[in-house]
UniProtKB/Swiss-Prot annotation:
It comes from the Eukaryota. Its EC number is 3.4.22.53. Residues 294-327, 324-359, 389-422 form the EF-hand domain. Its main location: cytoplasm. Forms a heterodimer with a small (regulatory) subunit (CAPNS1). Interacts with CPEB3; this leads to cleavage of CPEB3. It is found in: Cytoplasm; Cell membrane. This is Calpain-2 catalytic subunit. It comes from Oryctolagus cuniculus. Activated by 200-1000 micromolar concentrations of calcium and inhibited by calpastatin.
Length: 422
């Protein structure tokens, strides 16, 4: 008789057919064997005949539990490291290697393999480890009509010049010029993809992804290793290289002075509403940027950023600085728009922010896309400018409140509310 032992992970219901805990069939088994195999506990673990198993089950999925699940408390050979992450449409859901323009935007994790296996069973030295990529919450999503995503992962060797660093998110050029050292056997729409590898000691980048880009999802990555392996997320540190414009009125040429006098009128200042009209006329002449001008909200936050005297308007010097910034914004927007569509998609936005001097982690890119992209993941020129101005303003405020560069500030309620309505 062939028997199979099964565990119900919820531990509430057990098999009641042949060879269940109370089945008289156990009376025909040697008492010592019966005592060892048939412990009677309501623990969700039970025996059934293999023929009954084949009759009652039509599909078998291997569930990879943690390495110590079926061992005693005193013996745990394999080490487990676990990390949770997510893919977000338009920012961190870059799809597989078939999509080189977006693949690099997937979450990245560094695995440091330091010690070789003690027993080299196949005669080949190296570090043995398993990588399991699990989709989370898919049962919940299935109730909403969504099926499992098709998932997989790639493993890349970290270049020597970048080893030891965890604050650099590897970019598009790296993946265009570097082959994967290992990868999952396949991309498949199962809850978990798991593969076993052996690699020399060193640092490796793990990139989990869905097969196609723009698939929202949460995941868990588990790394099982015979020896301890360091495993952590790789992401850009927050940086802002903001050029402080030190402009005096003597630096402003006569042509710009005449232009300003013509635009500003008798009060010699430009309000947000006047600025909106000016920019509408200027941008209407551009064929390479699709825009109807800038919204009054964007114009107001631009005025607020540069209004040093609190009048709510821009004087000559302030307007000159703003005009220089707008020209810079136009240049970046045009250069990043590689398909010459006159617009920018959310994936191009990450590169545009870097060109503007901002390095941001994935979490912030997710927030920016949610805030400034439309449902087609397009970021128009108005939202692009508004995003840059808000970021610059927030960085400058933080710097003023943190003169010692500690990376932390304290705010009272009124200050928090004032900054929140920017």
């Amino acid at each position: 008789q062939k028997l199979i032992r099964i565990r119900n992970p919820w531990g509430e219901v057990e098999w009641t057919g042949r060879w269940n805990d109370n089945c008289p069939n156990w009376n025909t088994v040697d008492p010592e064997v019966r005592e060892r195999l048939a412990e009677r506990h309501e623990d969700g673990e039970f025996w059934m005949s293999f023929s009954d198993f084949l009759r009652h089950y039509s599909r078998l999925e291997i569930c990879n539990l943690t390495p110590d699940t079926l061992t005693s408390d005193t013996y745990k050979k394999w080490k487990l490291t676990k990390m949770d992450g997510n893919w977000r449409r338009g920012s961190t859901a870059g799809g597989c290697r078939n999509y080189p323009n977006t693949f690099w935007m997937n979450p990245q994790y560094v695995i440091k393999l330091e010690e070789e296996d003690e027993d080299q069973e196949d005669g080949e030295s190296g570090c043995t480890f398993l990588v399991g990529l699990i989709q989370k919450h898919r049962r919940r999503q299935r109730k909403m009509g969504e099926d499992m995503h098709t998932i997989g992962f790639g493993i890349y060797e970290v270049p020597e010049e970048l080893r030891g660093q965890t604050n650099i998110h590897l970019g598009k050029n790296f993946f265009l010029t570097t082959r994967a050292r290992e990868r999952s056997d396949t991309f498949i729409n199962l809850r978990e993809v798991l593969n076993r590898f052996k690699l020399p000691p060193g640092e490796y980048i793990l990139v989990p992804s869905t097969f196609e880009p723009n698939k929202n999802g949460d995941f868990c990555v588990r790394v099982f290793s015979e020896k301890k392996a360091d495993y952590q997320a790789v992401d850009d540190e927050i940086e802002a290289d903001l050029e402080e414009a030190d402009v005096s009125e003597d630096d402003i040429d006569d042509g710009f002075r005449r232009l300003f006098a013509q635009l500003a009128g008798e009060d010699a200042e430009i309000s947000a509403f006047e600025l909106q009209n000016i920019l509408r006329r200027v941008l209407a002449k551009r064929q390479d940027i699709k825009t109807d001008g800038l919204s009054i909200e964007t114009c107001k936050i631009m005025v607020d950023m540069l209004d040093s005297d609190g009048t709510g308007k821009l004087g000559l010097k302030e307007f000159y600085v703003l005009w220089t910034k707008i020209q810079k914004y136009q240049k970046i927007y045009r250069e990043i728009d590689v398909d010459r569509s006159g617009t920018m998609n959310s994936y191009e936005m990450r590169k545009a922010l870097e060109e503007a001097g901002f390095k941001l982690p994935c979490q912030l890119h997710e927030v920016i896309v949610a805030r400034f992209a439309d449902d087609q993941l397009i970021i128009d020129f108005d939202n692009f400018v508004r995003c840059l101005v808000r970021l610059e303003t927030l960085f400058k405020i933080f710097k003023q409140l943190d003169p010692d560069n500690t990376g932390m500030i304290q705010l009272d309620l009124i200050s928090w509310l004032c900054f929140s309505v920017l």
